C-alpha cells in the first residue's frame, strides 16, 4: 500500500486527515483511536474517566530532592562555587516542582526559569550541569553554540539539539520533555569583535533568535531515529516548553561593560585609574551583572528575558585547583590511582607536585580543564612502561617531575 493510500484500520481515517498514523503488522491506527483505547482501558480498570494527564504528562515518581540535598550532591563532584550551586539548586527544584504541579493554588500558572551560567573557562559550568542531571536522573545533552546555524545555512540546526536529547533516552518523547539541555559557549554567538560595545554579529543574532524559540517553548519536529529531514516523512513532535535549558559562557570582556556602568571615569584629577592586573576583580564584577550589561555585550533582550536565573562562578585560585585534584568523588588523582591500581601499583602525588600542577594550570588560564593534560604529560612515559615493569610497588610524583620534567620515582618490591 502506498503512503497516500494508508488508512486507520479502526476508523478508516486517511493519513492526510490524521495527525499521526502508526504502522503495525498489516495494520494502522491513528492518534484519535489510540486516545479512545486509552480511555476505554482506564474506565475498565478504574471505573472512571482518565485523569487530565493521561496520555500526556507522566506521573512523577519518587521524592524530589530539596535544594539542600541537590547542593550536597554537587559538593561531591564540584569544589567551591557555593553561590552558583545554591542558585542552580533553587532554580532546578522550582522547575521540577512546577512540572509536578502545573497550576498552583488559585489556578496560577507557574513559568519556567531557565538558567544562565557566567564564569571563566574551567570554573565548573559544564560539570555543574552534568552533576545536576545525574542527581535528578533525567536525560541530559550538551550542545556547543558555536556549531549552531540558522535554518537554511550549512551547519547544525538548533532542532538537532532535541534530536540528541531524544537519542539519550531511546527516543522516549515523554522522558525527553523533562530533560536538561546545556548550551555551552553562548557568549560566542553575540559578537565578532573583541570590543563588546561593537554591534552584534548578524548571523550570531540569527542563531540567538532560533534558540529563543526553542528555549521559550515550541514544538520541534524531529526525524525518526535522528535521520535527516526529507519530504513526505513522518516526524516526532517534541514540545520543549518543559525542557530546562542551561546556557553557559566565559563572557570574556563582559567585565569591561560592567565596569563602564559602575565606575564613572573622567578626565584629570577625578579620573578613575585602573591597575594593569584587573583579573582579581572580574569575579566581583560578574557578581553584579545586570541584564543591560548582557544586552550591551551582544545578547538579544528576548533571549536574556528567557534566562531569568543568572548564576556567576568564581575564578579558581591555586588552593581550589589543588582541592579539585584530590577531593571530589571523581577527582583526577583518584582516577589515575584507580588506573595504576588495576596493575596493582600505587600512585602518590607529593604536596609540592600538586601545587606545581595547580600553578601551571593558572598560568595557562585554563582553570580545572587544564589539569588533566598536565598530569597526563608527566605520567605518559611511566604509563607506557607500566605493564612491563615487574615488581613495581609504587610510583611517586614529586615537584621536580612537574617543573623540571624528571621521571617519577619508582619503588619496587624488596
UniProtKB/Swiss-Prot annotation:
It holds the Pfam family zf-C4_ClpX. Keywords: ATP-binding, Chaperone, Metal-binding, Nucleotide-binding, Zinc. GO terms for biological process: cell division; proteolysis involved in protein catabolic process. InterPro entries: AAA+_ATPase, ATP-dep_Clp_protease_ClpX, ATPase_AAA_core, Clp_ATPase_C, Clp_protease_ATP-bd_su_ClpX, ClpX_bact, P-loop_NTPase, Znf_CppX_C4. One of its GO terms (cellular component) is HslUV protease complex. It comes from the Bacteria. GO terms for molecular function: ATP binding; ATP hydrolysis activity; ATP-dependent protein folding chaperone; protein dimerization activity; unfolded protein binding; zinc ion binding. Gene3D superfamilies: 1.10.8.60, ClpX chaperone, C4-type zinc finger domain, P-loop containing nucleotide triphosphate hydrolases. SUPFAM superfamilies: Glucocorticoid receptor-like (DNA-binding domain), P-loop containing nucleoside triphosphate hydrolases. Residues 1-49 form the ClpX-type ZB domain. Zn(2+) binds at residues 8, 11, 30, 33. ATP binds at residues 120-127. CDD domains: RecA-like_ClpX. Belongs to the ClpX chaperone family. Component of the ClpX-ClpP complex. Forms a hexameric ring that, in the presence of ATP, binds to fourteen ClpP subunits assembled into a disk-like structure with a central cavity, resembling the structure of eukaryotic proteasomes. ATP-dependent specificity component of the Clp protease. It directs the protease to specific substrates. Can perform chaperone functions in the absence of ClpP. This is ATP-dependent Clp protease ATP-binding subunit ClpX. It comes from Neisseria gonorrhoeae (strain ATCC 700825 / FA 1090). The gene is clpX.
Amino acid at each position: 500500500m502506498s503512503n497516500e493510500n494508508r488508512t486507520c484500520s479502526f476508523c478508516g481515517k486517511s493519513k492526510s486527515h490524521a495527525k499521526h498514523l502508526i504502522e503495525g503488522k498489516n495494520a494502522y491506527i491513528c492518534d484519535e483511536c489510540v486516545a479512545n483505547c486509552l480511555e476505554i482501558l482506564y474506565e475498565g480498570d478504574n471505573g472512571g474517566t482518565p485523569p487530565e494527564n493521561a496520555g500526556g504528562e507522566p506521573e512523577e515518581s519518587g521524592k524530589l530532592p530539596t535544594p539542600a540535598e541537590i547542593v550536597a550532591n554537587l559538593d561531591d563532584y564540584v569544589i567551591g562555587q557555593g553561590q552558583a550551586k545554591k542558585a542552580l539548586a533553587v532554580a532546578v527544584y522550582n522547575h521540577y516542582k512546577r512540572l509536578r504541579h502545573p497550576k498552583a493554588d488559585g489556578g496560577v500558572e507557574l513559568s519556567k526559569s531557565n538558567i544562565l551560567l557566567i564564569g571563566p573557562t574551567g570554573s565548573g559550568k559544564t560539570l555543574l550541569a552534568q552533576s545536576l542531571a545525574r542527581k535528578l536522573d533525567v536525560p541530559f545533552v550538551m550542545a556547543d553554540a558555536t556549531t549552531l546555524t540558522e535554518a537554511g545555512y550549512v551547519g547544525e540546526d538548533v532542532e538537532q539539539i532535541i534530536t540528541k536529547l531524544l537519542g539519550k533516552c531511546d527516543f522516549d518523547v515523554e522522558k525527553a520533555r523533562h530533560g536538561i539541555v546545556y548550551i555551552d559557549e553562548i557568549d560566542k554567538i553575540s559578537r565578532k569583535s573583541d570590543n563588546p560595545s561593537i554591534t552584534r554579529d548578524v548571523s550570531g543574532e540569527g542563531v540567538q533568535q532560533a534558540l529563543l524559540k526553542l528555549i521559550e517553548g515550541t514544538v520541534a519536529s524531529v526525524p525518526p531515529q535522528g535521520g535527516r529531514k526529507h519530504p513526505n516523512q513522518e516526524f516526532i513532535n517534541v514540545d520543549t516548553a518543559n525542557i530546562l535549558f542551561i546556557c553557559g559562557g566565559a563572557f570574556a570582556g563582559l567585565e569591561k561593560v560592567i565596569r563602564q556602568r559602575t565606575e564613572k571615569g573622567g578626565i584629570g584629577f577625578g579620573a578613575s585609574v585602573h591597575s594593569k592586573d584587573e583579573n582579581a576583580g572580574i569575579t566581583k564584577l560578574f557578581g553584579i551583572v545586570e541584564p543591560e550589561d548582557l544586552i550591551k555585550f551582544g545578547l538579544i533582550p528576548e533571549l536574556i528575558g528567557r534566562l531569568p536565573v543568572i548564576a556567576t562562578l568564581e575564578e579558581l585560585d591555586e588552593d581550589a585547583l589543588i582541592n579539585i585534584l584530590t577531593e571530589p568523588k571523581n577527582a583526577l588523582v583518584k582516577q589515575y590511582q584507580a588506573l595504576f591500581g588495576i596493575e596493582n601499583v600505587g600512585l602518590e602525588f607529593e604536596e609540592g607536585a600538586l601545587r606545581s600542577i595547580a600553578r601551571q594550570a593558572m598560568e595557562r588560564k585554563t582553570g580545572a580543564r587544564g589539569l588533566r593534560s598536565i598530569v597526563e604529560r608527566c605520567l605518559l612515559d611511566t604509563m607506557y612502561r607500566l605493564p612491563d615493569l615487574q615488581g613495581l610497588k609504587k610510583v611517586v610524583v614529586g615537584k621536580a617531575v612537574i617543573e623540571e620534567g624528571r621521571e617519577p620515582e619508582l619503588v619496587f618490591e624488596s
